[in-house]
Structures are given as structure tokens and as C-alpha cells.
């Protein structure tokens, strides 16, 4: 039990006392202009990377039993060019250096669950990539949740927001 508690304390210490190594400042496509957010990446030593996501303006349905869940992935290219028909296709596919089937891509992350007001916040620990590996890649938010089965990308739907992952000022 002590080890588990100690690791959690270490993660809280990292988030409260360290600066992120990398960041992505997501912006919505022309069809989702209200979506803005910040995804921060903190090295967590031998445990991997802590990913902190804080996103606002997500499109929510307002229904009682809503499913306002949005897939989030690291994509292979850092380009976030958008056109009216296919937003952010320039970002390429999911980061997948080992050529694994979905959902075992390095870039597969848990989804964001939006609140009634369109805001979402999450903290995730992953060992699928290192912070240095994702510099110059992109973060994509999708309109639907990932089903974690459909190949090649989980049937997550339209790409609604994107950002290139950059090294933070502190680490340049």
C-alpha cells in the first residue's frame, strides 16, 4: 500500500511543483470555433508521462442522457491545416511507431468527458510515448468517443480541434 500512495504523492508533486515539458494549445476548426484548450505533458520518470487536458467550448447536446464524450489522440504530423470539407487531415493518422492495431497505438489516449457547460478536464498517466517523442506531433480532438475497436482509428468521427505539440519555453 505504501508504494501506491507514494507514487500518487509523486504525481501530485510533479503537477504542483514542475513545469510541463511540452504543450498543445488546441483550437477548433471553422465548424467548432468555440473549442479552445491546453494539453500539458509532464515527464513522470520511469512511470511515463502525465497528460493534463483542460478544454473549453466543446459542443454539448444538453440532453438528459447525453454522450458528450470526445476522443483525443496524438497524431503523427504536426500540421493542423483545416479546410471546410476535411478539417485537420494534414495531421495524418494516430502516432503509431510500432505499427500496432488500434487501440494499441502510442497516440491513443482516454476520451474527454464534457460537462454541461462544454468544459472538460482530465489527468492521465501513460507510458505509450515519451515527452520528447511527441514534440512536433499533433493533438486532435474528435467529435465522437473512440470505440477502441474499429480499425484504423476507432470510428471517432470528425476532427474538431487540433494543435501542434511544442516544447514549453522553460525547456527550449
Regions found by a protein language model. Name each.
Residues 1-172:
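N-terminal leader/targeting pre-sequences
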Amino acid at each position: 500500500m505504501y508504494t501506491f500512495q507514494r507514487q500518487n504523492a509523486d504525481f501530485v508533486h510533479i503537477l504542483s511543483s514542475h513545469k510541463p515539458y511540452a504543450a498543445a494549445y488546441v483550437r477548433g476548426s471553422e465548424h467548432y470555433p468555440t473549442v479552445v484548450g491546453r494539453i500539458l505533458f509532464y515527464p513522470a520518470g520511469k512511470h511515463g508521462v502525465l497528460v493534463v487536458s483542460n478544454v473549453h467550448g466543446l459542443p454539448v447536446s444538453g440532453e438528459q442522457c447525453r454522450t458528450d464524450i470526445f476522443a483525443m489522440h496524438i497524431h503523427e504530423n504536426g500540421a493542423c491545416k483545416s479546410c471546410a470539407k476535411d478539417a485537420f487531415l494534414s495531421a495524418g493518422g494516430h502516432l503509431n511507431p510500432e505499427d500496432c492495431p488500434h487501440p494499441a497505438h502510442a497516440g491513443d489516449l482516454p476520451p474527454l468527458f464534457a460537462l454541461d457547460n462544454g468544459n472538460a478536464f482530465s489527468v492521465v498517466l501513460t507510458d505509450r510515448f515519451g515527452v520528447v517523442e511527441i514534440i512536433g506531433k499533433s493533438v486532435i480532438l474528435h467529435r465522437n468517443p473512440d470505440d477502441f475497436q474499429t480499425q484504423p482509428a476507432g470510428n471517432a468521427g470528425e476532427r474538431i480541434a487540433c494543435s501542434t505539440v511544442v516544447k514549453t519555453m522553460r525547456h527550449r
